[in-house]
C-alpha cells in the first residue's frame, strides 16, 4: 500500500459521519479548531440508520440540551420534522418531552448543509483503518488508501461499524449497516491497543411499502396542534408538510408465526453473542419474554414525504425473511404488505466506557476521545450528545484548557456520561428521565437556562443564539419580578370576579406571584384579572418558564438544598495515582474496585457498585487529612 502524509495538520480529526460524528465535528469547528471529518461515504452523513424519529421521553431532553449548546440535531429536526408531538403534556413539567417524526432525506440534507457551510471544517471520504501514536498520545489516523492525517486529538464515533456483523435468520455477513462495509481493520487495531471491549447487538424492522397498506383498518395518530418546535433557533414556519402515523397490533397468529421461527433465529440458536437493548427489544425477544401478552402495539411511521416507505416501530427482528413476511401480513391492515427491506440484527464491538474520563477522553491514550455507540449507548440522541461533548473537549484538550464537564444535577448529558464511566454496562444504554435524581431541575423547557452560558464561554454557542438566550432570561426575570410587585386586595376585585378566577373569595391581600402558586390556577387564567396583563408581549416559552419557576419553586428549592449538601462529595477530586491501600479501613474489595475504575472524583467513586457510603466517608477523611498534612 502506498503511504503519504497529508500536508495539513489538524487540531481535531473526527472519524465517522453519523449523529455523534457530525455533532463532534461541528462543535470542534464552531470553537475555531481546524477540524477534519472522515467518513467512508459522504452521501450518508447524518443518516438515520434505524427509526425516522428524534426525541421522546429522556431523549427529547438530550436534544434540547444539545440545542442549548449550539448543536445541530434540534434545528435539523425542525427543518425535516413531518410530525411533532408533546409527550406527557398533562403530567409534571419534569417528564414532558417533544418527539418528532423526521423525513430521512430532509434530515440528512439539513445536516449535510450545516457541515458543508461550517467554517474550519474539512470533509474527506475514506474509511479509517488505523490510528497512529507517539508514545501514549494519539497523533493521527491512516485511511484505507494509505493517507496519514496528523492531528493533536482524535474523536472516534464508529457506531455499529467496528467488526460489525449483520444477521438475517441463520445467514450472516460482515457489515456496518445494510449496504455499508464493516470497519474490520480499525476494530482489530483498537483491540491491539488493549482497550477493554465487548460485543453488543441492535436491530431494525423490515420496511413496508405504504401503497400496500390498508389504512382504513388502522387507527390514525396525528401530530399536535399547534405544532411544537424543537430548537430555540427554529420556528413552525420551518416545518415541512405534517402527516399522520398509524397504529396496528400484533395478535395470537402473529405470535405463533414468530415462535415457529425460533429454531432459525440467530438470537435463540446462539449465532448472536452480543447483548441487545432491554428497552427496545426485538419482536421475537418480546414474544419470548412476555409470553402472557396476546398483542403488542405497532406504530407505522412514514419515512418521508417523497417516499412510500413506512417504518413499523415495534417489530425489530432478525428472524428469517419468510417469517418476516408472514408476521407482517398477519397484522390488521398489512395483509397484502410488500416488504421493501428486510429487518436484521447487527453485532458490533464497543469499548468499556469505564476506561473514559468524564471528558470522554480515554484514560489510556491521551488525546483519543470516544463518542456514541462505541461507548455502548443506543439511540441517535445519546450518540449526538456524546459527540458534541467529545468534540468540544477535544478542542479544550488541544488548547490546554479545562474540559467541559457536566454534572448530574446540571444535565441529562451529565447523567449519561457519569452512568457510563462509573457503572459501565452489560447491555446498550438508553436515556430515561428515571435515571436522573434531579429530574425537576433537568426539564426540556430550561435546557438553555442550564447550559447555554457554559456553551457560550467556550465558543460552542454563537452570538445570535447568545443574544436570544439573554433576551429570554431577562424577560423571565422581569415578569417574575412584576408578578411579585402586582398586588390585589379582596376590596379591589368584585366578588364574582374572585370566584371566577380563584374558585373562591380572596381572604387577604396577595400578589400575582403567590396567586400563581395555587395548584388550580394557571398563568392564562390569572392574566384575565383586570390590570394583570404585562405591558410587553411575552413569548409562549417565556410564559411557560415563568409559570414553572413560580409553581415549582418550593420543590426546586428543596432539591437545590439536597444538591448543595452533596457538592463536596461530587466535586472533591481524587489525586492521580492515589494508593487506596493507604486509606485506613477500606476493604480489599473496595480497593480493588477503585483501582480498576480509577474514578476522578469522590462523587464518581460513590456510584461504583460495591463502594459503600462507609467507604466514601473513609475516602473523605483520608483526603482531608492529606490536605491538612500538605498545609
Swiss-Prot record:
GO terms for cellular component: cytosol. Its cofactor is FAD. Keywords: Cytoplasm, FAD, Flavoprotein, NAD, tRNA processing. NAD(+) binds at residues 276-290. SUPFAM superfamilies: FAD/NAD(P)-binding domain. It is found in: Cytoplasm. Its main location: cytoplasm. Disulfide bonds: none annotated. One of its GO terms (biological process) is tRNA methylation. FAD binds at residues 16-21. One of its GO terms (molecular function) is flavin adenine dinucleotide binding. PANTHER family: GLUCOSE INHIBITED DIVISION PROTEIN A, PROTEIN MTO1 HOMOLOG, MITOCHONDRIAL. Belongs to the MnmG family. Homodimer. Heterotetramer of two MnmE and two MnmG subunits. NAD-binding protein involved in the addition of a carboxymethylaminomethyl (cmnm) group at the wobble position (U34) of certain tRNAs, forming tRNA-cmnm(5)s(2)U34. This is tRNA uridine 5-carboxymethylaminomethyl modification enzyme MnmG.
Amino acid at each position: 500500500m502506498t503511504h503519504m502524509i497529508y500536508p495539513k495538520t489538524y487540531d481535531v480529526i473526527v472519524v465517522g459521519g453519523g449523529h455523534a460524528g457530525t455533532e463532534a465535528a461541528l462543535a470542534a469547528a464552531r470553537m475555531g479548531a481546524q477540524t477534519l471529518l472522515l467518513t467512508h461515504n459522504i452521501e450518508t452523513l447524518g443518516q438515520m440508520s434505524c427509526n425516522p424519529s428524534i426525541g421522546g421521553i429522556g431523549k427529547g431532553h438530550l436534544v434540547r440540551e444539545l440545542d442549548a449548546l449550539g448543536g445541530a440535531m434540534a434545528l435539523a429536526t425542525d427543518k425535516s420534522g413531518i410530525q411533532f408531538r408533546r409527550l406527557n403534556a398533562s403530567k409534571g413539567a419534569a417528564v414532558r418531552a417533544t418527539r418528532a417524526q423526521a423525513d430521512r432525506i430532509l434530515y440528512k440534507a439539513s445536516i449535510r448543509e450545516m457541515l458543508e457551510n461550517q467554517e474550519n471544517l474539512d470533509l474527506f471520504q475514506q474509511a479509517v483503518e488505523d490510528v497512529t501514536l507517539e508514545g501514549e498520545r494519539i497523533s493521527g489516523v491512516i485511511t484505507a488508501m494509505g493517507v496519514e492525517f496528523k492531528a493533536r486529538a482524535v474523536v472516534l464515533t464508529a457506531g455499529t461499524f467496528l467488526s460489525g456483523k449483520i444477521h438475517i435468520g441463520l445467514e450472516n455477513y460482515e457489515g456496518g449497516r445494510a449496504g455499508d462495509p464493516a470497519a474490520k481493520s480499525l476494530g482489530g487495531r483498537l483491540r491491539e491497543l488493549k482497550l477493554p471491549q465487548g460485543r453488543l447487538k441492535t436491530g431494525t424492522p423490515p420496511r413496508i411499502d405504504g401503497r400496500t397498506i390498508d389504512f382504513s383498518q388502522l387507527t390514525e395518530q396525528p401530530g399536535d396542534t399547534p405544532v411544537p418546535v424543537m430548537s430555540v433557533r427554529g420556528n413552525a414556519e420551518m416545518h415541512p408538510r405534517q402527516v399522520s402515523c398509524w397504529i396496528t397490533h400484533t395478535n395470537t397468529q402473529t405470535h405463533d408465526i414468530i415462535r415457529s421461527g425460533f429454531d432459525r433465529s440467530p438470537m435463540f440458536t446462539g449465532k448472536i453473542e452480543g447483548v441487545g437493548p432491554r428497552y427496545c427489544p426485538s419482536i421475537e425477544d418480546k414474544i419470548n419474554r412476555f409470553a402472557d401478552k396476546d398483542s403488542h402495539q405497532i406504530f407505522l411511521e412514514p419515512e418521508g414525504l417523497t417516499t412510500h416507505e413506512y417504518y413499523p416501530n415495534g417489530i425489530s427482528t432478525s428472524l428469517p425473511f419468510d417469517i418476516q413476511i408472514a408476521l407482517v401480513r398477519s397484522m390488521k391492515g398489512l395483509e397484502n404488505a410488500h416488504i421493501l427491506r428486510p429487518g436484521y440484527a447487527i453485532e458490533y464491538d464497543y469499548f468499556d466506557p469505564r476506561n473514559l474520563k468524564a471528558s470522554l477522553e480515554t484514560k489510556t491514550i491521551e488525546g483519543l476521545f470516544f463518542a456514541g455507540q462505541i461507548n455502548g449507548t443506543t439511540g441517535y440522541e445519546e450518540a449526538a450528545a456524546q459527540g458534541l461533548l467529545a468534540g468540544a473537549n477535544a478542542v479544550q484538550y488541544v488548547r490546554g484548557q479545562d474540559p467541559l464537564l457536566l454534572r448530574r444535577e446540571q444535565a441529562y448529558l451529565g447523567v449519561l456520561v457519569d452512568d457510563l464511566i462509573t457503572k459501565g454496562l452489560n447491555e446498550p444504554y438508553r436515556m430515561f428521565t428515571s435515571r436522573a435524581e434531579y429530574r425537576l431541575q433537568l426539564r426540556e423547557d430550561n435546557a438553555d437556562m442550564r447550559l447555554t452560558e457554559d456553551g457560550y464561554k467556550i465558543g460552542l454557542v454563537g452570538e445570535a443564539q447568545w443574544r436570544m438566550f439573554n433576551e429570554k432570561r431577562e424577560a423571565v426575570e422581569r415578569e417574575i419580578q412584576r408578578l411579585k410587585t402586582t398586588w390585589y386586595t379582596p376590596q379591589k376585585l368584585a366578588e364574582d370576579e374572585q370566584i371566577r378566577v380563584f374558585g373562591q373569595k380572596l381572604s387577604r391581600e396577595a400578589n400575582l406571584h403567590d396567586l400563581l402558586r395555587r395548584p388550580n390556577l394557571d398563568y392564562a387564567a390569572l392574566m384575565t384579572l383586570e390590570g394583570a396583563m404585562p405591558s410587553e408581549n411575552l413569548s409562549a416559552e417565556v410564559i411557560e418558564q415563568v409559570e414553572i419557576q413560580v409553581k415549582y419553586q418550593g420543590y426546586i428549592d428543596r432539591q437545590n438544598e439536597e444538591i448543595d449538601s452533596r457538592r463536596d462529595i461530587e466535586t472533591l477530586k481524587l489525586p492521580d495515582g492515589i494508593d487506596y491501600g493507604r486509606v485506613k479501613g477500606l476493604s480489599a474489595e473496595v480497593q480493588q474496585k477503585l483501582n480498576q475504575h480509577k474514578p476522578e472524583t469522590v462523587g464518581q467513586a460513590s456510584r461504583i457498585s460495591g463502594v459503600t457510603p462507609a467507604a466514601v466517608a473513609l475516602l473523605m477523611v483520608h483526603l482531608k487529612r492529606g490536605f491538612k498534612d500538605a498545609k
